[in-house]
Amino acid sequence: MRKSLLALSLLAATSAPVLAADYSDGDIHKNDYKWMQFNLMGAFDELPGKSSHDYLEMEFGGRSGIFDLYGYVDVFNLATNKSSDKVGDPKIFMKFAPRMSLDAFTGVDMSFGPVQEVYVASLFEWDGTDFKTNAFSVNNQKIGLGSDVMVPWFGKVGLNLYGTYDGNRKDWNGFQISTNWFKPFYFFENGSFISYQGYIDYQFGLKDEYS
């Protein structure tokens, strides 16, 4: 995974000049948008643990002024299947990733090379369980620097670096590099399309006592 991120960075560094998100005219709402979708998903031999299960995912995102948002809520074992690998596990996992555009906030074009826009980036992750009853409970808050980077074929790719605060242990614990993309690559006559969507999260610098 480390090599994948390095390759992405090198690819971005050699990509074509970018169309910057210019807010110098004061109109911070000109790029506003919002979207939401529901997906019924199936996981097969999902790592770690080779877990197979179904889940409902509500995914959403958008832009309003200086704020950019992406998030999702997963509800596991929706059919309450007794043979599911998620029986007895946390029912819900939530991720929210709000970012504040420094370009829009300051009115200064901060683009350079393939970097289209710069953000103060944050990420919140919860699974709805209590650390006292579940030693693997997820309660993380992350803060750092984010960007939109233009990459050949993929187009705009989010690339963020966070410091991680473990809300359960009340302590800072390492860092995370995250990248995400959404690339429509085949279009139908009715306007629908097939897309390639994904993300990579790479954690490093974790404390031994929490690993």
Where are these regions (language model features)?
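Hydrophobic, lipid-facing positions within transmembrane beta-strands of outer-membrane proteins
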Residues: M36, D54-M58, M94-F96, Q141-L145, ...
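N-terminal carbohydrate-binding/catalytic regions of secreted carbohydrate-active enzymes
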Residues: F38, D45-P98
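Detector for outer-membrane/organellar transmembrane beta-barrel domains
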Residues: F136-S211
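Surface-exposed loop and membrane-interface regions of Gram-negative outer-membrane beta-barrel proteins
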Residues: Y72-F131
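Short loop/turn motifs that connect adjacent beta-strands in outer-membrane beta-barrel proteins
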Residues: A21-K34, G61-Y70, L102-Y119, M150-G158, ...
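Cleavable N-terminal export/targeting peptides
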Residues: M1-N31
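Outer-membrane beta-barrel proteins
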Residues: L47, T80-K82, G107-D109, T129-T133, ...
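Transmembrane beta-strands of outer-membrane beta-barrel pores
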Residues: L40-E46, V75-A79, S122-D130, L161-G167, ...
